[in-house]
Amino acid sequence: MTSHYGVGDGYHGRIAADGSRFDAYGLTTAHRWMPFGTKLRITNPSNGRSVVVRVTDRGPFVPGRVLDLSYGAFRTIADPGQGVTRVCFERI
């Protein structure tokens, strides 16, 4: 499962864990342990849409979630109103 962050939660414009400025509309993700800069292809199996993101932050810290996508990345593959969606991902 993945969720999204950055719009309406105060994170847009803050410094991410890798030292970059977080852009909620960019194509980034948070992951608990993957090295910063790692590129991942995220695919929503329910609609086939995919997006390539870069790991820039740490999290999510909610049980059952493996990624926390930026709002911009999430809206590429799913409706942000859903809040969460199932995804498949691969390192590229």
Each model region followed by its residue ranges:
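Secreted/periplasmic proteins
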Residues: 1-92
